[in-house]
Swiss-Prot record:
Subcellular location: Cytoplasm
Organism: Rhizobium etli (strain ATCC 51251 / DSM 11541 / JCM 21823 / NBRC 15573 / CFN 42)
Domain of life: Bacteria
Function text: Involved in unsaturated fatty acids biosynthesis. Catalyzes the dehydration of short chain beta-hydroxyacyl-ACPs and long chain saturated and unsaturated beta-hydroxyacyl-ACPs.
UniProt name for this protein: 3-hydroxyacyl-[acyl-carrier-protein] dehydratase FabZ
């Protein structure tokens, strides 16, 4: 397999995402990846439904997706880039840092969230990303995050 083959993935359905990420229901926050540009950028999709468990308490009368789950969706989209770049889906991607997090608008059931992630820097197994979450093209959240790739046998 060539280097290009291990780092390029134009899109990923849920089956491919589950090969890249260890997360499962109810904590898998990315339903689909519609674009991955090598190890530089990706766009992940989350279709928000009222049937998700966090809406039973956040908030029953006016459900709003918790901001921390938007951050998690950003991190998982970034994690898919890291996992695909490494060419070894057996590695773990640990979410390490969050900076400059801002929540601009509420996300509610029925929304389709796009997680736009862009790699800013990579040094060894440490990756830094800028992430935007958008609904209908409008910015709803943003953050700078850091991740670290760890082999499962070292976790």
């Amino acid at each position: 397999m060539t280097e290009e083959a291990t780092t390029t993935l134009s899109s990923a359905d849920i089956t491919e995402i589950m090969k890249l990420l260890p997360h499962r229901y109810p904590f898998l926050m990315v339903d689909k990846i519609i674009e991955i540009d090598g190890d530089n950028t990706a766009i992940g999709i989350k279709n928000v439904t009222v049937n998700e468990p966090h809406f039973t308490g956040h908030f029953p009368e006016a459900p709003i997706m918790p901001g921390v789950l938007l951050i998690e969706g950003m991190a998982q989209t970034a994690g898919a880039i890291c996992a695909k770049k490494e060419g070894q889906t057996g590695n773990l991607v640990y979410f390490m840092t969050i900076e400059n997090a801002r929540f601009r608008k509420p996300v509610v059931p029925g929304d389709r969230v796009e997680f736009h992630v862009k790699k800013n820097k990579q040094r060894g197994n440490i990756w830094k990303f800028h992430c935007d979450a958008k609904v209908d093209g409008a910015l709803v959240a943003e953050a700078d995050i850091g991740a670290m790739i760890v082999r499962k046998d070292q976790a």
